[in-house]
Amino acid sequence: MAVSLWQQCIGRLQDELSAQQFSMWIRPLQAEMDGDTLVLYAPNRFVLDWVRDKYINIINQFFTEQMGNDAPKLRFDIGSRPSAKKPEPAPVAAVRVPNPQTKASVGTSFNTTEPVVNANHRSNINPTYQFDNFVEGKSNQLGKAAALQVAENPGGAYNPLFLYGGTGLGKTHLLHAVGNGIIKNNPNAKVVYMHSERFVQDMVKALQNNAIEEFKRYYRSVDALFIDDIQFFANKDRSQEEFFHTFNALLEGNHQIILTSDRYPKEIDGVEDRLKSRFGWGLTVAIEPPELETRVAILMRKAQESGINLPDEVAFFIAKRLRSNVRELEGALNRVIANANFTGRPITIDFVREALRDLLALQEKLVTIDNIQKTVAEYYKIKMADMLSKRRSRSVARPRQVAMALSKELTNQSLPEIGDAFGGRDHTTVLHACRKIAQLREESHDIKEDYANLIRTLSS
């Protein structure tokens, strides 16, 4: 009875949680009775701890309401329920691929004179990108959690997994980390990572060589296919057609697909609706620009890997001024380290100011409160004067709060200074706005998207 009630409990959780929260934390759970105990099996420790910390009260309350004193005890475990049957792995077709000794990436040639062999598909997975060296923060926590689950249960956890966000935020790192995780668990797994333009080039070459069937067999035989920057499929009708059928074939065989893009699937122009619809079949997760604490952690990790002692105050100084993406942070730190090695000077705040003076000057020039106000007003189609007015209607107040939150995150101005710039408001008003927008970014997909879009615009 308890197991059947678990299905009803799932229904309640689905009603109370966002679609992403439900897909991420509840859908992977499996339930089975063990005596008078209901055992909930999670795919990994991360999911187990999260569900136990965040949702245990809701689950207990549901069973108490339904069964009273007869409610089962709850226990959490990692893995699959013992009675769950594991499907037999699908047979992998033999395919013709390029000689792995050549410099070309896997899948770049379809010469029909080459022998038919089983492909070494994983030669383009970068072994340096691991979960252990991926710096986690609130901005990428869900993305990493989803990627971990896919690595442990490819084709079963979230399929497809769609990661989206701006350039240099770690999407590619996660793709390779998943690939390395899959290969660690199954050394014979056939995993392919590539940029979407490589898929297009392979298809064009196959058409030129009358080897399109070879192309199809190759891509439909892999255990996992990871394609970066899927937005480059835009307006390439034949490539979209081939990928559509490849996508369907892989999903039907329970083979894992992970895609990345710089924008939400439905916002990708020039891509067929049937593809965009399929992109959302599994789990879609945003990777956002790192918050201050994560930026500091990234700098400290990079410095440690480089054998450099980076003082905390220097890391905070850099992190507060460079906010757009991880790549920019690492590039700035590399410049600081190179200058320090060349001059023999210690790394201090004054030294960093000198080493990064052009970059810091550009950032200060680009991101000002006035610039933020104008950008937000234009984005929400309100008047610039509304940013300074006392109007409280939501159509005006919400954009104003967004602009205040962005001003706190993207400038070095204090709360009182931000309040002055918004019509002489008190610093507590600014603090309330920042907290409100932080809350809404957790609860509202629209606000989350708006905020991410504005940061990309202001940081570009």
UniProtKB/Swiss-Prot annotation:
Coiled coil: none
Origin: domain of life: Bacteria
Record region (Domain IV, binds dsDNA): 341-460
Family matches, as InterPro entries: AAA+_ATPase (IPR003593), Chromosome_initiator_DnaA (IPR001957), Chromosome_initiator_DnaA-like (IPR020591), Chromosome_initiator_DnaA_CS (IPR018312), DnaA_C (IPR013159), DnaA_dom (IPR013317), DnaA_N_dom (IPR024633), DnaA_N_sf (IPR038454)
Any one GO molecular function term: ATP binding
Keywords of this entry: ATP-binding, Cytoplasm, DNA replication, DNA-binding, Lipid-binding, Nucleotide-binding
Region feature (Domain I, interacts with DnaA modulators): 1-84
CC annotations in GO: cytoplasm; plasma membrane
Sequence segments annotated as region (Domain III, AAA+ region): 124-340
Signal peptide (residue range): none
PROSITE patterns in UniProt: DNAA
Renumbered residue ranges of the record's region Domain II: 84-123
Any one GO BP annotation for this protein: DNA replication initiation
Residues reported to bind ATP: G168, G170, K171, T172
CDD domains linked to this entry: AAA, Bac_DnaA_C
Cellular localization per UniProt: Cytoplasm
UniProt comment concerning the protein's domains: Domain I is involved in oligomerization and binding regulators, domain II is flexibile and of varying length in different bacteria, domain III forms the AAA+ region, while domain IV binds dsDNA.
Quaternary structure annotation from Swiss-Prot or TrEMBL: Oligomerizes as a right-handed, spiral filament on DNA at oriC.
Family the UniProt entry places it in: Belongs to the DnaA family.
NCBIfam families: DnaA
Task of the protein: Plays an essential role in the initiation and regulation of chromosomal replication. ATP-DnaA binds to the origin of replication (oriC) to initiate formation of the DNA replication initiation complex once per cell cycle. Binds the DnaA box (a 9 base pair repeat at the origin) and separates the double-stranded (ds)DNA. Forms a right-handed helical filament on oriC DNA; dsDNA binds to the exterior of the filament while single-stranded (ss)DNA is stabiized in the filament's interior.
Protein name (database record): Chromosomal replication initiator protein DnaA
Gene for this chain: dnaA
